[in-house]
């Protein structure tokens, strides 16, 4: 096997898992190469790849490590191990995604799901080139993300469903490492100021009160630091009556001060271009707005 040292390990892991032995004297070759661009890919060059399988060679060309990873996922799908021999059909595949974010969400605020289960799902979904996990961490029922500043948030008495079940910061860091290995972007979400009964039970105040706003700013800053390498943070803002017109702008400013882009549900808080970075459409009432990038998730959610 030859190629760029930064990416040959991805292919080597697949070879080992497929039971394909590596040898310097083997007649079949595997070549991995990073290139400036994949000419046929009209969008999302960073995920594009050119995979060629012949009788003599497996060749992968990609612009980034992520493109190599998706090429290997395609090889996993092509590999036939139904007999004692490992078979891969000869082919040439030039592939790139139409959409930069291809994701799934778990509402673990309502219903706790173990990280072991989520990891299994990520391993499966990454085979199909799903590249984003939206992690809804807080709800009326529970606050699932450990806080070192306010540990009482995850106390069993402040949860009405799956009491005591939460994700520690150490677990989150390990999980993020796992996601990076599978080239999964994680979008964490703390829903605010609505869907926050767990917050109110804990502190005896609403997020939009002066006391509550001070607390949620500390929590949001702590969470942004925990998810330091993730480029986005979701702040919710749906299904709530706003009593403090400065609440959302201040939260967006805090997220941006941490070097991240802020995402908000739509319908939710109303924004003009520049006031939010991405709107995530969640129902038929959510409409794309000129000047505001959007993620289209309409008609794809089931509250549970």
Where are these regions (language model features)?
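Contiguous, structured surface segment used for ligand recognition
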Residues: 1-99
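Short helix/loop capping segments that flank catalytic or ligand/cofactor-binding pockets
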Residues: 68-71, 114, 304
């Amino acid at each position: 096997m030859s190629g760029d040292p930064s990416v040959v390990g991805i292919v080597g892991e697949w070879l080992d898992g497929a039971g394909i032995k590596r040898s310097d004297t083997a007649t079949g070759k595997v070549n991995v190469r990073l290139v400036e661009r994949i000419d046929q890919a009209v969008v999302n060059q960073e995920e594009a790849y050119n995979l060629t399988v012949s009788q003599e060679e497996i060749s992968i060309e990609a612009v980034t490590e992520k493109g190599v990873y998706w090429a290997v996922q395609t090889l996993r799908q092509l590999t036939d191990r139904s007999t004692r021999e490992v078979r891969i059909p000869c082919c040439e595949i030039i592939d790139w995604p139409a959409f930069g974010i291809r994701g799934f969400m778990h509402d673990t605020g309502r219903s706790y799901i173990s990280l072991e289960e989520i990891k299994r799902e990520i391993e499966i979904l990454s085979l199909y080139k799903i590249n984003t996990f939206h992690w809804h961490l807080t709800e009326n029922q529970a606050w699932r993300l450990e806080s070192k500043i306010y540990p009482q948030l995850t106390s069993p008495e402040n949860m009405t469903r799956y009491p005591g079940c939460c994700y520690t910061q150490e677990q989150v860091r390990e999980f993020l490492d796992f996601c990076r290995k599978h080239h999964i972007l994680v979008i964490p979400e703390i829903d605010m100021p609505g869907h926050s009964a767990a917050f109110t039970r804990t502190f005896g105040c609403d997020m939009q009160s002066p006391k509550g706003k001070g607390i949620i700013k500390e929590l949001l800053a702590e969470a942004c630091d925990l998810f330091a390498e993730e480029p986005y943070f979701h702040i919710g803002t749906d299904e709530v009556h706003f009593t403090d017109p400065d609440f959302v702008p201040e939260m967006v400013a805090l997220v941006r001060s941490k070097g991240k882009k802020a995402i908000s549900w739509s319908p939710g808080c109303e924004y003009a271009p520049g006031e939010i970075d991405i709107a995530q459409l969640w129902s038929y009432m959510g409409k794309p707005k000129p000047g505001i990038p959007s993620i289209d998730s309409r008609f794809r959610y089931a509250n549970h």
